[in-house]
Amino acid sequence: ASGFGTYAKNLLERLHASDKYELAEFAIYMKSSDGHDVPWKVYGNAPEDDEPDEHKQLYNSNPNNQFGAWRFDKVVLDFKPDIVLTYRDPWMDMFISKSPLLPYFHWVWMPTVDSDPQKQSWIEGFSKTDAILCYSEFGVKTLKKDAGHLLNVVGCASPGIDPNIYKPYDKKQIREELGLDPNVNIIGTVMRNQKRKLFPELIKSFAKFLKVAPPEIKDNTYLLLHTSYPEKMGWNLGYHISEEEVGGKVLATYVCKTCKRWRIDFFRDSLNYCPHCKTISSVMPSVGLGLEVPDLVKVYNAMDLYVQYAICEGFGMPQVEATACGVPIASSNYSAMEDVLQWTKGYPINIQKMYREVETNAERVFPDNDHLVQIMINHLMLSAEEKANKSQEVRNATVARYDWDDCAKVWMNYIDTYQPKMLQGKWNSPPRPLQIHEKVPEGLTNEQFVEFIYNAVLLEPDSAFGYEATKLVRDLNIGAQVDHGVIEPIDRNKLLERCLNQGKNKIVIEKIRSGQAQLQEDIFIKRANENYGN
């Protein structure tokens, strides 16, 4: 499961076990028919196999639909929630801030906050919530600094780990089971192969370690990469390993596509020989073909030191999975990583420099390679007793801080004490008189035109002078919509047409909500209700 999926499973299980709430899950990568064994209602976002082709075409027509944009309003119209909880990246859940049904439910969002400052468009979306939780103390600090006057930041609900699953094993025994020399040192990482994960710098640092470390540790030390390769937008790992001339010192995890067996082997590019089924069909793990959790625990336990080398993290779950297994971490001392380092007694890697990223306008970091090299040396030079003590220290600290029960209590404390506002929870309230004006008055400036759009077409007067509205004025003034990677012509007619569709959709949804029109029971809603009823 993804990190968000793991979070949802652990939170929902505890909310359900409390027997205090009626629950529904909007499962993004599930079909409703897959939810028959779940004890709460499950609405699937993925199209059913027997749905009409036009539904599947609609699903594929907008990238946001994979995150739920195309079905969210139908789900809340059917379930009529008092409160909606979300916990994903800003770009995944931002569509909820535009929902016509926003007045009828209390919304608590825990977005990932991986850098400072946050994008202004995200801040505006966050401001539509009733409360904000964060994955890390860094997130709380950043949002209060950037927009404390706009946001109700109520706390931190960091993920937990199951200490009965993520736990230390005898390292030599695990290595022998995996076919590894029990007496070597292994520096490892578990990161997806993405731009923000600094694989080239990690490989470069390891190469320098091999040059400057004392012979008694460098000769029997290896780098283990548990990652995906190749990735469409990821690093060319083979190139960087070859460039640094460390080919014989880098290990990788491989999973066989044919027999599904996995092993740790020397890095041999993206396709490798499987000794179990004797086919050339072993690949490096990915989201679609990964390891089961008990096997991932073995990967962590094979390591002496775990490294999270990234420009930023919204949390970085593998760090606490590693420390729960008694493996100390070294991580970039920035964003959520700085909190994880503090709570797990890890090794903070100094920041060499900060820079602004063009895509997000956020501060990102390059950690200090030389400092990482020194951390590697210092840790591997510890005596066996000192390593054992450090392992116990990081394990104890992790179990004390990252607990799923504590995580769920943060959410439950808020749910049990919040006060609904205005129409929240009043799904049977009388119809709201909504009317849009299609005829634009003549002689308006761009500023007046945008104000008219928000007041008379979108019916969102409170947003008429926000960031999005201000940007629309600017775009109209220059005749183009300008975002990172996007420069497209825009004019009043195009903007009016788009906003008229949104305004008319708002009126239709309000009619359905108030009983003046009927919501067609799509297959996914019918299956969700049937499964829950059974």
Regions found by a protein language model. Give the residues of each.
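C-terminal amphipathic helix plus adjacent low-complexity
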Residues: 271-273, 278, 358-365, 369-448, ...
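A short helix/loop element that forms part of the nucleotide-sugar donor recognition site in Leloir-type
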Residues: 166-180
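Nucleotide-activated donor-binding/catalytic signature segment of Leloir-type glycosyltransferases, i.e.
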Residues: 234-298
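Short hydrophobic beta-strand element within catalytic cores of glycosyltransferases
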Residues: 328-331, 341, 345-348
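Conserved donor-binding/catalytic core segment of Leloir-type glycosyltransferases
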Residues: 180-197, 203-206, 223-225
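Aromatic "clamp/platform" in nucleotide-sugar-dependent glycosyltransferases that forms part
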Residues: 311
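Donor nucleotide-sugar binding/catalytic pocket of nucleotide-sugar-dependent glycosyltransferases
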Residues: 128-169, 252
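Extended catalytic core of nucleotide-activated donor transferases of GT-like folds
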Residues: 38-131, 137-138
